[in-house]
């Protein structure tokens, strides 16, 4: 029987919900299967390394199969929603404090040494970050930023996809491509003074470059890929990556499918590795990290986020649609081999296959991020 477009879209939305919104055995088994045949050397390096994932979200008050498999030492968690105001943001911070209090395996991270201690203690460090800055009071930036820093905020961008008081997001540049505003310059100065790392993922080209020139400490792209390989507005130019490295920053390779898609080959671990190798060749191993961009707690996806992803799937140009039509089922919602943070050991295995040395692997897994946090946080 031939399915109508409406029936196809409904089936794709169902698959997306199954992957994103439920802690299903089928999804767990699919994800963990990619870790089964990794080498003993990869497992050893994975176990010994400090691993920092600089983009995750929806952490709840307990560990789970994905976190246990990840081996992560610390997670940079998106705490406020991308468009939350100050009140909503505060509620989100309270929720994360509760999550950490509810689980002995979690450790709140305030300074870089807390990450080192988490490794020694066999715990998972929780870094409070954001993917927006709308919750900051614009009329008193220094005091507002200091207040959120005292609450625990450690990573924050100057925009998320669209325009803010500080500058343009990556999608706003399609029409305006404005630069960093005067308030944006003040925001960066306030963040540096209060010990918050400046993140430029989701930020527009011109605003990002302005921010890199305005920064006096390392700034980062927590989860972005090379636009030269994958021409997507969310990815960054060679010029941005080079400037980021020039001031001591780090670019995190991201597994989010749309920004690893060249329009022809379905995203997978090889495309993820291509992005990593590209940036290592361009700016050096010392300036590359990993920001997976996946759920820390499978099944915890917020309703509004689920609706957003369902909307993304309603296009014949979407990865999910083309993947479904190719008979890939669950794989329409993820990258083969690097579906989530649960696949860090598989990443290590592929890094070895690509010729990375153990020291280089450990830098990329977490030591580069640790260096930046030492330089940008109050330690």
Where are these regions (language model features)?
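Active-site core of metal-dependent hydrolases
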Residues: 173-262
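N-terminal hydrophobic targeting/anchoring segments and the immediately downstream early-domain regions
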Residues: 1-159, 164-175, 231-241, 245-247, ...
């Amino acid at each position: 029987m031939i399915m109508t477009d409406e029936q196809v879209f409904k089936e794709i939305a169902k698959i997306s919900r199954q992957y994103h919104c439920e802690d299903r055995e089928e999804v767990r088994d699919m994800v963990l299967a990619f870790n089964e045949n990794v080498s003993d050397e990869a497992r050893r390096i994975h176990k010994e390394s400090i691993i920092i994932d600089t983009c995750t979200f929806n952490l709840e008050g307990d560990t789970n199969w994905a976190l246990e498999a990840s081996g992560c030492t610390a997670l940079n968690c998106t705490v406020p929603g991308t468009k939350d105001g100050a009140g909503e943001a505060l509620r989100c911070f309270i929720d994360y404090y509760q999550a950490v209090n509810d689980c002995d395996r979690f450790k709140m991270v305030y300074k870089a040494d807390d990450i080192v201690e988490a490794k020694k203690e066999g715990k998972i460090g929780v870094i409070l970050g954001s993917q927006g800055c709308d919750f900051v009071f614009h009329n008193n930036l220094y005091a507002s930023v200091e207040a959120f820093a005292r609450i625990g905020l450690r990573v924050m961008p100057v925009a998320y996809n669209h325009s803010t008081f500080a500058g343009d997001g990556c999608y706003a540049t399609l029409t305006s491509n404005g630069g960093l505003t005067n308030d944006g310059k003040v925001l960066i100065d306030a963040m540096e003074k209060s010990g918050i790392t400046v993140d430029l993922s989701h930020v527009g080209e011109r605003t990002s470059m302005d921010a890199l020139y305005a920064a006096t400490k390392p700034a980062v792209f927590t989860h972005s890929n090379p636009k030269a390989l994958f021409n997507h507005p969310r990815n960054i130019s060679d010029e941005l990556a080079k400037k980021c490295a020039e001031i001591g920053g780090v670019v995190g390779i991201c597994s989010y499918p749309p920004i690893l898609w060249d329009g022809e080959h379905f995203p997978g671990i090889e495309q993820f590795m291509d992005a990593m190798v590209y940036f290592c060749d361009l700016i050096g191993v010392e300036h590359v990290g990993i920001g997976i961009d996946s759920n820390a707690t499978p099944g915890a996806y917020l309703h509004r986020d689920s609706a957003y992803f369902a909307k993304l799937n309603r296009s014949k140009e979407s990865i999910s649609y083309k993947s479904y039509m190719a008979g890939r089922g669950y794989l329409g919602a993820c990258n083969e081999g690097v579906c989530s943070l649960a696949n860090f050991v598989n990443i290590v295995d592929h890094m070895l296959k690509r010729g990375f040395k153990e020291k280089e692997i450990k830098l990329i897994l977490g030591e580069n991020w640790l260096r930046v946090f030492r330089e940008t946080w109050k330690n």
